[in-house]
Amino acid sequence: MTLAKEIARDLLKIKAVYLKPEEPFTWASGIKSPIYTDNRVTLAYPETRTLIEDGFVEKIQAEFPDVEVIAGTATAGIPHGAIIADKMNLPFAYIRSKPKDHGAGNQIEGRVAPGQKMVVIEDLISTGGSVLDAIAAAKREGADVIGAAAIFTYELPKAEKNFNEAGVKLVTLSNYTELITLAEAEGYVSPEGLALLEKFKHDQENWQA
């Protein structure tokens, strides 16, 4: 079994992912979605956590061999990033969503030298906006961001467009296609539910029509 499939199976099993194509969730953006993901839950399950962190290390070593520092997005990317940095014996930093309004006013916490090659860790990619904002902040402070890595992506066309426009390489451990295919095969959703889930991937506005 591939890593992407193993992680998809674990996310379903521990209920980090909920699929409700017939009774959709409403995301903060207002989008009606048949899927809801809370990857923070993975931290409570040592086997899943180890699978994820080892997967990150393997992907980063393969895709970004020159990495010199790992950074996590606040807050979801912090625990994963810290574990990855420890496993890889690399420095760790984290990137706030905005600079502190007191003290030194830092947006990056930790020590990042100018030109240091950074990989930014996020737990979930929907449109990619938050991690790309974090990457822009890291670049402003002198980091050489060579890529981003996340546990899971919804594979939304908007995310692909955003990463391409920003010139940022993204790698993920698992993805929406792997997960919904496995979910139907293992009885989490019906064939009709799978059809709705597939429609959502291609058209987030009109998938229920």
Curated annotation (Swiss-Prot):
Catalytic reaction list: orotidine 5'-phosphate + diphosphate = orotate + 5-phospho-alpha-D-ribose 1-diphosphate
User: At the top level of its lineage, which domain of life is listed?
Assistant: Bacteria
Which positions are annotated as binding 5-phospho-alpha-D-ribose 1-diphosphate? 96, 100, 102, 122-130
Which pathway does this chain act in?
Answer: Pyrimidine metabolism; UMP biosynthesis via de novo pathway; UMP from orotate: step 1/2
SUPFAM superfamilies, alphabetized? PRTase-like (SSF53271)
What is the required cofactor set for this protein?
A: Mg(2+)
The UniProt annotation places orotate binding at 126
Pfam families in the cross-refs? Pribosyltran
| The enzyme's E.C. designation | 2.4.2.10
A GO BP entry is: pyrimidine nucleobase biosynthetic process
Keyword annotations for this protein, in alphabetical order, are: Glycosyltransferase, Magnesium, Pyrimidine biosynthesis, Transferase
InterPro entries referenced in this protein's UniProt entry, alphabetically: OPRT (IPR023031), Or_phspho_trans_dom (IPR004467), PRibTrfase_dom (IPR000836), PRTase-like (IPR029057)
MF terms from GO for this chain are: magnesium ion binding; orotate phosphoribosyltransferase activity
Quaternary structure annotation from Swiss-Prot or TrEMBL:
Homodimer.
The entry assigns this protein to a family as follows: Belongs to the purine/pyrimidine phosphoribosyltransferase family. PyrE subfamily.
Job description of the protein = Catalyzes the transfer of a ribosyl phosphate group from 5-phosphoribose 1-diphosphate to orotate, leading to the formation of orotidine monophosphate (OMP).
Which PANTHER family does this chain map to? OROTATE PHOSPHORIBOSYLTRANSFERASE, URIDINE 5'-MONOPHOSPHATE SYNTHASE
HAMAP family according to UniProt: PyrE (MF_01208)
Q: What is this protein called?
A: Orotate phosphoribosyltransferase
Q: Which gene encodes it?
A: pyrE
